[in-house]
Curated annotation (Swiss-Prot):
Part of a sulfur-relay system required for 2-thiolation of 5-methylaminomethyl-2-thiouridine (mnm(5)s(2)U) at tRNA wobble positions. Belongs to the DsrF/TusC family. The keyword RNA-binding does not apply. This is Protein TusC. GO terms for cellular component: cytoplasm. Its main location: cytoplasm. It is found in: Cytoplasm.
């Protein structure tokens, strides 16, 4: 079966890429069981708890990340260096259970997927 990776690289709410990526992720989950979800750069901000997008008149789609385990999507990886570069604690209570990886391990894990979709 084909392994598909979704890579989130943009901050939430500034554009629609995070929401569109999440929609695509849920749609593809009906077609394949081997899905990996990767967060790097500003994409790590997608998983911050207690966001208030309504303050900037945006839809709150972040809570939808919490349903990924219901779709049997549990391979989620966060770049530890990206977290630290943004001044965030690695002990943050992310909205999704993620495995923090050093950049080399993160890239190695990503390389094991057949298709990579970036948002």
């Amino acid at each position: 079966m084909k392994r598909v990776a979704f890579v989130f690289t943009h901050a939430p709410h500034g554009n629609a890429s995070g929401r569109e990526g999440l929609d695509a992720l849920l749609a593809v989950s009906a077609l394949t069981e081997e899905i990996g979800v990767f967060f790097v750069g500003d994409g790590v901000l997608q998983l911050l708890p207690q966001q208030q997008p309504d303050q900037i008149l945006m839809r709150n789609y972040i809570a939808t990340f919490g349903v990924l385990p219901l779709y049997d999507i549990d391979c989620c990886y966060l770049c530890e260096t990206s977290v630290r570069q943004r001044g965030l604690s690695i002990d943050t209570n992310w909205v999704l259970d993620v495995e923090l990886l050093a950049p080399e391990a993160w890239r190695s894990k990503l390389a094991s997927y057949h298709s990579i979709l970036s948002f």
